[in-house]
């Protein structure tokens, strides 16, 4: 990502995503280049509710939540491409995942960097390549498929 860098703070993210505590997993957008990619940040705190049970003696962020954080970053990229006509009534559905791999654990105190690049859009389905990193090392990667629907429509 190089040309026009857009960054978004939590206040703007809250206007674009319907997620709220405890499932909002993007704290800031560091770079966003419409039609290309996004680089976002999740600060992983010991205060996250999932650490109570995963795992009490060795807290590790669940892999599915890393994937959810990547999907939320992809949603922010999608909404930069196509502004919803009715943002209050628009939902972003995660409809598929391919090639998910987990390479290292994510622990309290880590900064999870979420890199998502646009691959293609066909028949209402967005496809992205997504990589989550900690300290420059890959923590997780996957191809994500998503769609945008109104809240009253079935996914």
Curated annotation (Swiss-Prot):
The keyword Cytoplasm belongs to this UniProt entry's keyword annotation: yes
A single GO molecular function term of this UniProt record: (3R)-hydroxyacyl-[acyl-carrier-protein] dehydratase activity
Enzyme Commission identifier(s): 4.2.1.59
Active-site annotation: 54
GO biological process: fatty acid biosynthetic process; lipid A biosynthetic process
Localization per Swiss-Prot or TrEMBL: Cytoplasm
SUPFAM superfamilies according to UniProt: Thioesterase/thiol ester dehydrase-isomerase
Catalytic activity from the UniProt record: a (3R)-hydroxyacyl-[ACP] = a (2E)-enoyl-[ACP] + H2O
Keywords associated with the record: Cytoplasm, Lipid A biosynthesis, Lipid biosynthesis, Lipid metabolism, Lyase
Pfam families, per database record: FabA
Family: Belongs to the thioester dehydratase family. FabZ subfamily.
Free-text function comment from the UniProt entry: Involved in unsaturated fatty acids biosynthesis. Catalyzes the dehydration of short chain beta-hydroxyacyl-ACPs and long chain saturated and unsaturated beta-hydroxyacyl-ACPs.
Protein name (Swiss-Prot/TrEMBL): 3-hydroxyacyl-[acyl-carrier-protein] dehydratase FabZ
